[in-house]
């Protein structure tokens, strides 16, 4: 797995106050031994931790969608914490997400913040905009021998809520082990179970890359050493994006906003 960052602005100093114009586009090359040659170069744009609410409004979301669509992805993966407030108050700010364009669609999983504000109403709202939620389930991307499997699981903390809870066994049950398996899971630490279920690569968010130095020390403790970037757990690769929004203060220090472009490569 290799990565390269294309900054959308000059990087002469650490960034503090942020806006929708300050995202970095990070390209990550992920080689999968089971990926069919026909899918070499398949692109996934990963968006995470948008945290719609407060100063992250409809205009901010629309700009993120526009930046995503300009990358012309084959698939969009939204790895949780898209919202930070009640549906009744914020639904209109989420509307631009319905404009995401990708040949194979936009898939999402829950993050911990969806549960703070009512996960079921938000899942229904975002599904109505065209997002497909993977709740301990998977989808086949492509056709026949020219395909891979995309799985998604509920957030690590969701077992506290009725009808929810991470279930990797269910998400991977009955799958063809000869097919590549990409997993969407909000929290990086979920990889420690995913590695035992045949996952080839897990895409996660949650950490914000620490968001504001030196908070990253606390984040690394909570996620058992996982903060941002690439990791390897046995045969399972992990990529943790810094996310395209922020939580709390409109501030990021040494952890810029990120839109991730994952390029799948056949070995």
Q: What kind of region is each of these model predictions?
A:
Residues 22-27, 31-267:
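Soluble catalytic domains of enzymes that build or remodel membrane lipids, polysaccharides, and related
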